[in-house]
Amino acid sequence: MQVRFTLPDGMVAFMPWQTLLPETAFAWKSTGAFSHASAEPMRVAGGELDVLTLGPGFDRDSAVRDWIARGASASSRLFGQLPVRRALVIAVPADRAGPGFGMALRGGGPAVVIFLDRHVTRESLANDWTATHELLHLGVPRLPPEDAWLFEGLASYYTEVVRARAGSISPARAYQHLLEGFERGRSNESSLSLRDESSQMHERRSFYRVYWAGAALAFLTDVEARRTSGPTLDSALQAFAACCAASEEDWNAERVLAHLDRSLGAPHFTEQARRWLDRREFPALDGVLRSLGVAPGPRGEAIFGPALNAAIRDAIMAPAPLPAAR
């Protein structure tokens, strides 16, 4: 199949497509843009991003581009580099206050679209985690919506971890954000199991429950892998991204967990999923948090105390170096 665009003078089409389009360009959701603006490739974190800002009045391109670059740099603190060699990132101005809203899509190639307040400033972007979160999604191949607990859980957990590793927030603040997220998920009570809630997340608007219960399972897996002194969840995700982030195959949570557990050398993640996916209760975290010496703090930062696994607590958020160029 050939695709030809006939465009007005000065307008350019921006698509994540390759010269020879894969089947996913037609079978999976994708995004693209038509614009009179130009997009210069951004080399960052060992990869390349084609960054495009759209819309009248959205004239803070350099601030937005710098923010996206920081998000890519932060995500590399997990994967060792940008998890895909090249991706399209589209920033769209919107009438919304607070953090941005984004989506990571795979049809025809990896792409991220982020909707931002059209009046954003460098100061407001400094605390916005959306770019980091969406770029982390690119480290896992496309999964079906019913597996949202896994792909959103991993991204939610590591959004805080990698921002601490990059120095954007302190480890104490990162843990506080995790504790607050876990509490939001716990408070979002449901009569459904996590598995069923994931399948109906959009219909039931149960985002907190699904995102943060999934993040809790990633956290429990991370701590258990470190406690047993084997390979870490970080290293398992790095290996997985290297082989499969850009995969055009159909994946599901069970297959991803099996791959990660092979790298971990033990079924850590699968066991957590089996323990909690078919239950209505939020995953139990109190014992693990006590073993780490982590407790909620009064001023936006968690309180650290002496504990059996304090070294694990510190290692999770320890600074990570920038990646080398590919």
Show which residues each predicted segment covers.
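Soluble non-cytosolic domains of exported or imported proteins
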Residues: F58-R70, T121-A126, T130, P145, ...
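Structural helix-adjacent loops and short alpha-helical linkers that scaffold large soluble proteins
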Residues: R165-A174, A225-L233, S263-T270
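Carboxylate/His-rich catalytic cores and anion/metal-binding grooves
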Residues: P22-A27, S75, P83-A104, S156-E160, ...
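Acidic/His/Gly-enriched intrinsically disordered linker/tail segments
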Residues: E146-A216, D222, Q238, C244-S247
